[in-house]
Amino acid sequence: MKLAVVFLLTTVVFTLAQSQCENCADLQCNSTVHCCLVSTVRLPRWKREISRCGRLAIRRWRCEEPNSNGIYNRNCPCVPGLECREFRRGRRICLPEQSSTSTSSTQGPITSSTVTTQSEATTETETTTAAEGK
């Protein structure tokens, strides 16, 4: 019975791997929508690496950081416009890219001499108007 289950599992894994993308080992996945995923199947006295084309991760999918060789273990990198960031407990997911111009940490501290309150602005306007009216 165990042998039959192992045989069935092996057959399913090979069929899935070949039907996904036969040329992934040669890095011929369509890089605009796919990445190359390489997984290792281990059975008693047998080990095999299976390559397949996986879909690029979209928002909130698990992801891996882009690398130089284009081969990934479990998850593909994010589609353009998203970035792979740590979410919880070491999990990384695709989230919108953070714009560096919108962060307030890049701005310098505000000094008291540069702060103008609403009442000061109103008083200054009234003084200017009265001076022009003379």
UniProtKB/Swiss-Prot annotation:
Q: In which tissues is it expressed?
A: Expressed by the venom gland.
Report the SS bond pairs: C24-C35, C29-C53, C63-C84
Question: Mind telling me which residue stretches traverse the membrane in this protein?
Answer: none
Signal peptide extent? 1-19
Keywords for this protein:
Disulfide bond, Knottin, Secreted, Signal, Toxin
- Main localization, broad class: secreted
Could you tell me which residues belong to the region Disordered? 97-134
Compartments in which it is found: Secreted
State a single Gene Ontology molecular function.
toxin activity
- Show the ranges annotated as biased composition (Low complexity): 99-134
Any one GO CC term of the record: extracellular region
Q: What the record says about its domains?
A: The presence of a 'disulfide through disulfide knot' structurally defines this protein as a knottin.
Q: Which family does it belong to?
A: Belongs to the neurotoxin 32 family.
Q: What protein name is recorded for this chain?
A: U34-theraphotoxin-Cg1a
Organism per entry: Chilobrachys guangxiensis (Chinese earth tiger tarantula)
